[in-house]
Amino acid sequence: MAFIVADRVKETTATSGTGPYALGGAATGFQAFSAVASNDDVVYYAATDDTNWEVGLGTYSSNSLIRTTILSSSNSDAAVSWTSAIKDIFLTYPAEEAVIEDSSNNVSVGN
C-alpha cells in the first residue's frame, strides 16, 4: 500500500448509491487511476456531477475506488448517495490536508 499523488488523473463513473466507485475509463487528455495506482494504494479524490460533490480518501482496487474517509461533501460532509448519472472523479489535494510553507518559511495549514 502506498499513498499516491499524481497529476492529471481523471475518469468518469456511473456509480449510484454510496458504495465504491466503479471507474469508467480516463477522460480525454487525462490518465486513468490504473496508470498511477496499484491495488490497495490510497489517494485523495473528488467526485462531482456538477451539482453534488464529495472529497475524500479512497483505496484503489481493480478499477474501483473504495470510499475510505469522506472529508467534505455537498451532503453535510457525509457520503453522497449518487444517482446513476455520469460523474467525474479525479485525484485532488484537499485544502484541509494542505501544509504550505511560504518564501519566509512561515507554515500554514488549509481549512
Question: Residue spans of the language-model regions?
Answer:
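Short, solvent-exposed secondary-structure boundary/capping segments
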Residues: S62-L71
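Ser/Thr/Gly-rich low-complexity blocks that favor extended beta-strand/coil architectures
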Residues: S34-L57
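Generic alpha-helical secondary structure signal
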Residues: G25, S34-A37, D49, S64, ...
